[in-house]
Amino acid sequence: MRNLFLMAALLMAAWVTAQVPFVGEWITIDDESGEQKSVVNIYKADNGMYYGQIVTLFEEPDALCTECKDADYNQPIVGLTIVRDMQLVDGELRGGKVLDPENGKLYYAKIYLENGKLILRGSLDKRGLIGRSQTWIRK
């Protein structure tokens, strides 16, 4: 009976993960240097939207967001929510924004999976024509 319960719990966990493939911790890779920069935890909030919070910063773990605006100004980068207000639409996260802590700017965001990797596209325009992409790998 105990084995049956354990198997059911494992199947349920696998099913939940399969339903929400974006949720979890991702290692961010700098698109210019190719180096690992941080770990971001993507989660689904009670409001049904998806967010991403920096949980680890590999260089300067005590760094502050000195370029950020408003409530994010001078806040620790670890703990900062950089992926905001994303909605799951047709297998992609869309409609929200991404914060670049290096320059403090918010960009339109789109997130999708490709070959098991997360692709985050940050852009100046809603259509994603003017911007750049980063590839993140699951932790």
Residue ranges and their predicted role:
Residues 1-4:
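Positively charged n-region of N-terminal signal peptides that target proteins for export
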Residues 11-15:
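N-terminal signal peptide c-region/cleavage motif recognized by signal peptidases
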Residues 28-100, 106-107:
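Central antiparallel beta-sheet cores of small beta-barrel/beta-sandwich binding domains
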Residues 98-115, 121:
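Acidic, glycine-rich flexible loop segments
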Residues 115-117, 124-139:
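Edge beta-strand at a domain terminus
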